[in-house]
Amino acid sequence: MNVLVIGAGGREHALAYKLNQSNLVKQVFVIPGNEAMTPIAEVHTEISESDHQGILDFAKQQNVDWVVIGPEQPLIDGLADILRANGFKVFGPNKQAAQIEGSKLFAKKIMEKYNIPTADYKEVERKKDALTYIENCEFPVVVKKDGLAAGKGVIIADTIEAARSAIEIMYGDEEEGTVVFETFLEGEEFSLMTFVNGELAVPFDCIAQDHKRAFDHDEGPNTGGMGAYCPVPHISDDVLKLTNETIAQPIAKAMLNEGYQFFGVLYIGAILTKDGPKVIEFNARFGDPEAQVLLSRMESDLMQHIIDLDEGKRTEFKWKNEAIVGVMLASKGYPDAYEKGHKVSGFDLNENYFVSGLKKQGDTFVTSGGRVILAIGKGDNVHDAQRDAYEKVSQIQSDHLFYRHDIANKALQLK
């Protein structure tokens, strides 16, 4: 069958790589993709992921059987709805169901209604109300802007001054807009991907841990993710089971109950508190860079899993008996302003590197985004995989990239 992947980043690179391995898949297309994907897929950078008509026309011309949507924006914009209305099979939720990521308030209200464990929250609609709220709230407090923010719309404020600064960032020159304040939760964060079709929810039996902060020791601003690893040895199978029972199954039923038919992967960003696992966020798609490490470890056929889910079967994931560590190299300055167009070399176009922000200029690759390339390390355990990942990092040549030196350290310290 012919499969079309939508998106241009490392997550989509990993999806295309994994789908290309399937015996069920004849051809993988990617729109818009990036040139690093050309060994495994037919890439069409001339079509934008926001060009719904162009994507639809292409899918018709190429007799595409399945469309797999990687990023959140096309889901929120209703690309899945348009494709389904024209008879295409789509892995990814419709516009209504994608609100679970598109609106933090939408997600909080559903969790509140169905008693799904999460932090207490307060919503405000005006800047002046936000400034009033922080006069009497407990610190630290988590400040979240409603809507999509590429993983960067969350600020943890330790003081009232930091909270004021966060409010200024969220509102800018505007006086109105939804901001959600949450009680700060302490504990160990982890990411659980769950395949969902209506009330059928099948969680991965392998979790990943992301590293959101820009710099070592979890310092600096939030980013889209500076690295990830799996499995997470210090979070037990019992926690995974509990997360499934108290979060994954209830949210699938709650969405259906509220009239939202979710089909695709639901990312559960959770935290293990002293009171058990609680939800930090939901995403309506694979995490990035969690997808890259999880799909590298997945032994079974991703396309078969998607078909099983579509047919309402409880699919069984199989995993390689190894650990995976992924280290992200980003443009200096990210997640704030950064320069583009700097040469990057030294890496191979294979499963050891997944490209997020590079484009071809003549025969060389140059930077085109904030997060640039993820180096993948593999090993019998997290320690060996970490060493392998940083060896892969050392092969990359560029004066304009930075990376964290402590990806997966937590697993080694907490063993």
From Swiss-Prot:
GO biological process: 'de novo' IMP biosynthetic process; purine nucleobase biosynthetic process
EC number: 6.3.4.13
Binding site for Mg(2+): E281, N283
Top-rank EC class of the record's enzyme: ligase
Cofactor: Mg(2+); Mn(2+)
Cofactor binding note of this UniProt entry: Binds 1 Mg(2+) or Mn(2+) ion per subunit.
Gene Ontology terms for molecular function: ATP binding; metal ion binding; phosphoribosylamine-glycine ligase activity
Known catalytic reactions: 5-phospho-beta-D-ribosylamine + glycine + ATP = N(1)-(5-phospho-beta-D-ribosyl)glycinamide + ADP + phosphate + H(+)
Binding site for ATP: 134-191
SMART domains recorded: GARS_A (SM01209), GARS_C (SM01210)
Pathway(s) served: Purine metabolism; IMP biosynthesis via de novo pathway; N(1)-(5-phospho-D-ribosyl)glycinamide from 5-phospho-alpha-D-ribose 1-diphosphate: step 2/2
InterPro entries, alphabetized: ATP-grasp, ATP_grasp_subdomain_1, PreATP-grasp_dom_sf, PRibGlycinamid_synth_ATP-grasp, PRibGlycinamide_synth, PRibGlycinamide_synth_C-dom, PRibGlycinamide_synth_C_sf, PRibGlycinamide_synth_CS
Keywords from the UniProt entry: ATP-binding, Ligase, Magnesium, Manganese, Metal-binding, Nucleotide-binding, Purine biosynthesis
Record domain ATP-grasp: where: 108-311
Classification via PANTHER family: PHOSPHORIBOSYLAMINE--GLYCINE LIGASE, PHOSPHORIBOSYLAMINE--GLYCINE LIGASE, CHLOROPLASTIC
HAMAP family reported for this sequence: GARS
Family named by the database record: Belongs to the GARS family.
Name of the protein: Phosphoribosylamine--glycine ligase
Organism: Staphylococcus aureus (strain MRSA252)
The gene coding this protein: purD
